[in-house]
């Protein structure tokens, strides 16, 4: 029985805007991979996130994610959401990944703030069937899964890295450094492509 279960690839799915990707994302993915014995973590940059307004073009966010994850052999990046036309919904992401890897057991990695809103997500009942959800704690967030199916949701505390993409964008816009908040290659990409500079 144990051998049969383990013979199924265990794949983490780390969806996000990644605008920009930072060390907090990478640490969370690494901690979940270790705790849940994942074979791989697929980072999925959103195409056009339905819950957010203006974001950096998807191709920039995809390339920054590729740069940030390149040194970890367990990390890969998928274009499934970037190439989809229209808004990005988690249910579409998981359906597409399940179709690509029907033999895999999927673990969707999300933050405590997002898991609190999950009951408002599209086709939530199908979400539970497609993946196990892992909610990672962020500094200042209380984790609670009351009202959610306990067998489909796990909580995991990760090292407290108080980094946010919003703060990273703001620092760049104010001419402040983001070294050590985001991977070195991403810092260079942001500078080369003049991202997050205010045009107002």
Curated annotation (Swiss-Prot):
Catalyzed reaction equations: nicotinate beta-D-ribonucleotide + ATP + H(+) = deamido-NAD(+) + diphosphate
Top-level class of the enzyme under EC nomenclature: transferase
Pathway involvement of the protein, from the record: Cofactor biosynthesis; NAD(+) biosynthesis; deamido-NAD(+) from nicotinate D-ribonucleotide: step 1/1
Gene Ontology biological process terms from the UniProt entry: NAD biosynthetic process
Known EC number: 2.7.7.18
Domain of life: Bacteria
Keywords: ATP-binding, NAD, Nucleotide-binding, Nucleotidyltransferase, Pyridine nucleotide biosynthesis, Transferase
Keyword Nucleotide-binding: yes
InterPro entries cross-referenced by the UniProt entry: Cyt_trans-like (IPR004821), NadD/NMNAT (IPR005248), Rossmann-like_a/b/a_fold (IPR014729)
CDD domains: NMNAT
A Pfam family annotated for this UniProt entry: CTP_transf_like
Keyword Cell inner membrane belongs to the record: no
GO MF, one annotated term: nicotinate-nucleotide adenylyltransferase activity
Family indicated by similarity: Belongs to the NadD family.
NCBIfam families, sorted: cyt_tran_rel, nicotinate (nicotinamide) nucleotide adenylyltransferase, PRK00071.1-3
Function summary: Catalyzes the reversible adenylation of nicotinate mononucleotide (NaMN) to nicotinic acid adenine dinucleotide (NaAD).
The name this protein goes by in its record: Probable nicotinate-nucleotide adenylyltransferase
Origin species: Leifsonia xyli subsp. xyli (strain CTCB07)
Species lineage: Bacteria, Bacillati, Actinomycetota, Actinomycetes, Micrococcales
